[in-house]
Amino acid sequence: MKFGIEFVPNEPIQKLCYYVKLAEDNGFEYCWITDHYNNRNVYMALTAIAMNTNKIKLGPGVTNPYVRSPAITASAIATLDELSGGRAVLGIGPGDKATFDALGIEWVKPVTTLKESIEVIRKLLAGERVSYEGKVVKIAGAALAVKPIQKAVPVYMGAQGPKMLETAGMIADGVLINASNPKDFEAAIPLIKKGAEAAGRSMDEIDVAAYACMSVDKNADKAKQAAVPVVAFIAAGSPPVVLERHGIDMEKVEAIRNALKSGNFPEAFKNVDDTMLEAFSIYGTPEDVVEKCKKLAEMGVTQIVAGSPIGPNKETAIKLIGKKVIPALKE
């Protein structure tokens, strides 16, 4: 089992660098930084992190092919790989409609756009001059003047829906799945496998990552309470098929959605129940978290990404995961 950590760059980058260096020193192998226009710029954050770390692999988790052209993303990743001494990874997904609506960007054919963009990015990173006439992506003789250190920078696809998961199985080096519960991987992994088999690939070639809401503390109740706000947002944004899979009370979810819309956060958080917490987070003492992670490993998960909130105290949680969780999952 590999272990990664995810950060939203919503606080000073110096602080982010401190946390990632701490994670590196505590055995984390991957660092994923989210890419949203309203937070600190993902590539500026990754540049600073690269210059303050030595071993940890790092990349956007995840960017998308709409806000930047594939050539701009390829250039950024090649530069990050050079700067980090060959540690770059690329996490790229379809993005979300709400963000694109706010930015006035049309969300066209997400599966096709992502597939074509990855193909173009890989060609550019390989040093090719690219002329490409896809259904969505068009490139006319573009080439990079910078080359990555790695022969092939690993490409991880952010995927949730059936078509996206199948496509990831066909083309991606890894899949980043926003999920914390074995039931979600029971549904997702057969779809990845189907895509892999269609492309003549083995599942051994694909790193299946659980992009999990994690909250770790010596005090299980404190860990649980810290997960509540994140779980509220996950529940509010989950499609009916996911809510039904976990037997979640739809009335409570509707109450959470309405409360979040009106900015009444205490009311939203009050409606988060244990069923939601079990479905959408990995929380508890290090021992609790180890047991939950083992169940994900049994389903075929090969990387656990500790995502927000990580714990009631980030520094303490990173150290606890490094000392108690990672070693137990490496046995």
Swiss-Prot record:
Name the Gene Ontology molecular function terms of this record: coenzyme F420-dependent N5,N10-methenyltetrahydromethanopterin reductase activity; oxidoreductase activity, acting on paired donors, with incorporation or reduction of molecular oxygen
The catalysed reaction is: 5-methyl-5,6,7,8-tetrahydromethanopterin + oxidized coenzyme F420-(gamma-L-Glu)(n) + H(+) = 5,10-methylenetetrahydromethanopterin + reduced coenzyme F420-(gamma-L-Glu)(n)
Gene3D superfamilies per record:
Luciferase-like domain (3.20.20.30)
- Please provide the record's keywords in A-Z order: Cytoplasm, Methanogenesis, One-carbon metabolism, Oxidoreductase
Q: What is its main location?
A: cytoplasm
Compartment(s) of residence:
Cytoplasm
Q: What Enzyme Commission number(s) appear in the record?
A: 1.5.98.2
Output the GO biological process annotations, alphabetical, semicolon-separated: methanogenesis, from carbon dioxide; one-carbon metabolic process
Q: Which family does it belong to?
A: Belongs to the mer family.
Q: Which NCBIfam families match?
A: F420_mer (TIGR03555), PRK02271.1 (NF002619)
Q: What is the purpose of this protein?
A: Catalyzes the reversible reduction of methylene-H(4)MPT to methyl-H(4)MPT.
Protein's UniProt name: 5,10-methylenetetrahydromethanopterin reductase
